[in-house]
Amino acid sequence: MVDARHATGQHGEDEAAALLQRTGHRIIARNWRHGGLELDIICETGDTIVFVEVKTRAAHGLTSPTDALTHQKRHRLIRAARAWLAAADAWDRACRFDLVCVTQRGATCTLEHITDAFDLTETLGGGDTSWQPW
C-alpha cells in the first residue's frame, strides 16, 4: 500500500512532468536512481539537459517548496547529475537545474517552474569551479 506522503509526491511529479511537456520539454527519465541518489525528472529543451527537482507541499504546510531545496539537497542533485551524465556519456551537453514547486490545495494544485533554480558556483563554494569535469 502506498502511503499518503508518497502518493502526494507522485501526484506532484506527474503534474510537473505534464507542465514540462506542455512547455516543450522532452522527458528523458523519471525517478532515475543511482545508488542512494535520485533525480526526479531528467528532460531536455533545445540542446540543454535539464535536471528537475520537484517539491510538493500542502498549502498549509510549514515550509515552502523552495525552502526544501537545501544546500545539502543541491549537493546531492549535483552528484546525481554527474552520475547520470557519466552513464549517458553526455558530458558535452549543456545542463541546468530547475525546480518545480507544486502546492496542493485540496483537489487542485498550483505549479511554479523555476529555471536555473540555483547558482552552481554558490553551491560548490568557488567562483571558478565547474561542476562538469571538462
Swiss-Prot record:
Task: List GO molecular-function terms, semicolon-separated.
Answer: nucleic acid binding
What Pfam families would the database entry show? UPF0102
Gene3D superfamilies registered for this protein in UniProt: 3.40.1350.10
Entry-linked InterPro entries: Restrct_endonuc-II-like (IPR011335), tRNA_endonuc-like_dom_sf (IPR011856), UPF0102_YraN-like (IPR003509)
Record-linked NCBIfam families: PRK12497.1-3 (NF009150), PRK12497.3-3 (NF009154), PRK14680.1 (NF011273), YraN family protein (TIGR00252)
Checking PANTHER family in the record gives: UPF0102 PROTEIN YRAN (PTHR34039:SF1)
Annotated family: Belongs to the UPF0102 family.
Protein name, entry field: UPF0102 protein DVU_0833
